[in-house]
């Protein structure tokens, strides 16, 4: 992919990261993490390899980007637990003793983790939040807790398009409904489930 070759994983990116580490970062007591969307295990081992002197850890997205539909990320299907488990185990095993990983389930671009990976009903919200936190904190890597995650925050019940502020959701709604690829009802459900506004509501 041209994006990966020239923007994300450019031909001299490792050379430049090593120079930055050598000339600047190594002189201070700092920790570095690289947001590496689309990174492979092999690339992650280069970016955060213990003997590479580039970054301390990678922030990879395979476990949260893996599920989609014919319309990109816009779906209301629950995440496939077996696939999620397979991806998490792969990263744990392949980076063990070689590189360091960031552990997360949510951020400003993802729906709330309890709504996505757990059960956000009144009966199971708290148990789901605790189970997900235990999962993340018991693995090898550095856990990241996104604001509100420690409270078990769930997706917000947006019920009209006017409630949304994120242009990604608004534009996708218009594009997919006007092209007849999704009904307005299905699209409202999809952006309500996967939209970024869910993670941007006040705590």
Give the role of each language-model region.
Residues 3-203:
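Active-site and adjacent substrate-binding regions of carbohydrate-active enzymes
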